[in-house]
Regions:
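Catalytic-domain carbohydrate-binding cleft regions of carbohydrate-active enzymes
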Residues: 1-241
Length: 241
């Protein structure tokens, strides 16, 4: 295994209703959660390629901005401008086999709305967590919407489908999406021994609504990766990297 490049992607699983009432969760994201994200981002802002970048689904980010105070909104806008808060192409995890075409189009539109507002590129990557399986409508929908990469993290108690570590998921139409499907919400820090590529995305996903990693954890991750791969390019990034 020859790893040339490692990208650390940091994310929290957004679950509206599992850990608290829905309104309480949304308010938490717009207050304490945002403050914690800002603290880690600020603490790592001078670390160059290792500055913390937090990736969110599009809809809770939009809702966070709508609900937060003007002071927090200004801070959030600054973090987005600095590239330390990012979002992917989907609004949240969903059961898309129960959705109609209109639902799918609306869902993809939330991320595009944020891209227009913040004048950022449209995301070409998507992430869903906590749903054990998805049907073949998903690659059709995503590829039609310009999404090229998908990460799926199934529940830890569920056995994932026996697929390669990274594969092309092809819809009946022939459209396809590059896909990773892991047991658990994210990936391991280090790539598996059978990883076939020279780039590794370490998707470090914290549990339901639990918030961002600390600056010290970011430094610890870097030290472990640098020890294992002394010649690799290591950086924090988003799913689009």
């Amino acid at each position: 295994m020859s790893i040339r490049r490692i990208v650390l992607v940091f994310k929290t699983h957004f679950d509206i209703g599992f850990t608290r009432l829905s309104e309480e969760i949304l308010d938490y994201y717009a207050t304490d959660m945002l403050d914690r994200v800002a603290a880690t981002c600020d603490a790592t802002a001078e670390l160059g390629p290792m500055r913390y970048i937090w990736t969110m689904p599009a809809w809770p980010l939009k809702e966070m901005r709508r609900r937060c105070t003007p002071e927090r909104r200004a801070k959030l806008d600054d973090l987005v401008a600095r590239g330390q808060v990012a979002w992917h192409a989907l609004p949240f995890t969903s059961h898309y086999d129960f959705c109609g075409i209109e639902d799918a189009i609306y869902g993809l539109g939330v991320a595009r709305e944020l891209s227009r507002f913040y004048q950022k590129p449209i995301s070409r990557a998507a992430k869903m967590t906590d749903v054990p399986g998805h049907g073949r409508f998903l690659p059709e929908m995503l590829a039609s919407g310009g999404v090229e990469y998908l990460h799926l993290g199934c529940n830890t108690f569920a056995k994932p489908v026996d697929v390669p570590p990274i594969f092309w998921w092809e819809a009946p139409s022939g459209k396809r999406v590059l896909t990773m499907y892991n047991s658990g919400y994210g990936t391991s820090l280090l790539p598996p021994q059978d990883w076939p590529l020279d780039t590794w995305i370490a998707l470090l996903n914290t549990q339901d609504n639990s918030g961002p990693q600390s600056a010290q954890i970011v430094l610890d991750y870097y030290a472990k990766l640098r020890s294992a791969f002394p010649d690799a390019e290591i950086s924090c990034g988003s799913l689009d990297d």
